A protein has these predicted regions:
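Short edge beta-strands and adjacent turn/loop segments
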Residues: 1-5, 31-59, 94-95
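N-terminal presequence-like segments and adjacent domain-start helices
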Residues: 1-17
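Short, conserved charged micro-motifs
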Residues: 13-18, 63-68
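Short, non-transmembrane amphipathic alpha-helical segments
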Residues: 19-30, 69-84
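Short amphipathic alpha-helical interaction patches enriched in hydrophobic/aromatic residues
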Residues: 60-62, 80
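C-terminal structural segments of small proteins and small subunits
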Residues: 75-101
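Short, low-order "capping/linker" segments at domain edges
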Residues: 101-108
Length: 108
């Protein structure tokens, strides 16, 4: 279950929900067994320079090798930038969760 966080200056006009849905679709295209991508958006009114930082974390898997990550990064960058209409600094970071990370679903 990947996670995607959008951290951005609130002077950007963007539809965070649409971008998060698109991120999930790109990840699932590259890795159909990845599951749902949990997403959050954090616009901030206090910032220095207009920017968008996209942080994606995934569990390490054998098939998520260098070639996989390069293709995923390129497709994510292209997809996300298609939703931007203003100049801004853009950063994309894809990282792997540590072996101590626990993820599951809680049902009371």
């Amino acid at each position: 279950m990947p996670h995607a966080d959008l951290k951005y200056s609130n002077d950007l006009t963007l539809n965070a929900s649409t971008i998060l849905t698109s991120i999930e679709m790109v990840i699932q295209t590259h890795d159909p067994g990845s599951g749902n991508c949990k997403g959050r958006a954090y616009p901030t009114a206090e910032f220095h320079h207009t920017h968008l930082l996209v942080e994606i974390s995934m569990l390490p898997k054998a098939h998520r090798d260098t070639a996989f990550m390069a293709a995923l990064s390129a497709d994510l960058e292209t997809t996300i930038k298609a939703y931007l209409s203003q100049p801004c600094s853009f950063s994309l970071m894809i990282s792997f969760s540590s072996e101590n990370y626990i993820t599951n679903r809680f049902e009371p």
